[in-house]
């Protein structure tokens, strides 16, 4: 797998990710580029200086910014490992469940939001959903190095398992209670549905409560990553008052 772009490569190095080598442009000389190269050298990483033509051929995103880190495949966490984040830090669990997000740019943006607002981990499905790839990592600006992500076979079964662990599950969908009026104390998870179809009916039935982002415009839907950002920020703010 390739990690592309300056922020993503820098955060991968800082997080201690397994990096086989760093491919670096032999023509880039700016301060930010040089800082990352020095960081890679300080970690004793292999650095291969190449021309931009080779970087362009190697790049999966077309936006390498002169740096590509060659790594092992992305390592997913387990749901238990996500739950252990809060347990080990003696705090309430805060988990995001994604029901069928297919766009890698949306997934990358969502991971970035989750890292900013202290989400313990993200749960995604194995089927009909985007996995963590080069575009996701690049769009996340390196947040994939810090947020635990679990890939599960059955989202609904996972929700039932979380509820058995005393995690209160909120579905973010139209027709629910105002998201701003809910008390989110205790362990909680929020479910965000897919870009085109929202959250499945069965999944919504399993949620303990449906919450809705209030809107006043004529268009009554939001991009999945935007909706996630609003929901996560709202819950984070209420949990930390």
What are these regions, as identified by a protein language model?
Residues 11-17, 84-177:
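RNA substrate-binding interface of SAM-dependent RNA methyltransferases
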Residues 48, 122-125, 212:
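Short hydrophobic alpha-helical runs that function as membrane-insertion/retention elements
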Residues 137-143, 201, 205-241:
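Structured adenosyl-cofactor binding patch, chiefly the S-adenosyl-L-methionine
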Residues 41, 159-163, 236:
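Surface-exposed amphipathic alpha-helices with a cationic face
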Residues 1-85:
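N-terminal positively charged helical leader segments and presequences
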Residues 170-223:
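Active-site/ligand-binding-proximal alpha/beta "capping" segment
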């Amino acid at each position: 797998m390739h990690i592309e772009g300056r922020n993503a490569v820098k955060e991968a190095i800082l997080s201690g990710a397994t990096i086989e080598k760093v491919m670096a442009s032999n023509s880039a000389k700016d301060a930010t580029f040089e800082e990352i190269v020095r960081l890679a050298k300080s970690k004793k990483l292999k650095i291969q200086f190449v021309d931009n033509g080779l970087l362009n051929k190697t790049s999966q995103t077309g936006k390498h910014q002169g740096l590509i880190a060659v790594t092992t495949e992305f390592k997913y966490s387990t749901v238990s490992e996500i739950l252990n984040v809060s347990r080990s830090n003696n705090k309430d669990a805060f988990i995001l469940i994604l029901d069928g997000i297919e766009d890698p740019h949306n997934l990358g943006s969502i991971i970035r939001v989750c890292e900013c607002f202290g989400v313990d981990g993200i749960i995604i499905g194995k089927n009909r959903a985007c996995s963590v790839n080069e575009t996701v990592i690049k769009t996340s600006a390196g947040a994939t190095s810090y947020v635990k992500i679990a890939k599960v076979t059955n989202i609904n079964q996972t929700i039932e398992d979380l509820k058995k662990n005393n995690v209160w599950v909120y579905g973010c969908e139209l027709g629910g209670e105002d998201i701003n009026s809910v008390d989110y104390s205790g362990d909680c998870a929020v479910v965000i549905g897919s870009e085109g179809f929202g959250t499945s009916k069965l999944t919504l039935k399993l949620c303990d409560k449906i919450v809705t982002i209030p809107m006043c415009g004529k268009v009554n839907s939001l991009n999945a990553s935007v909706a996630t950002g609003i929901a996560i920020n709202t819950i984070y703010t209420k949990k930390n008052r």
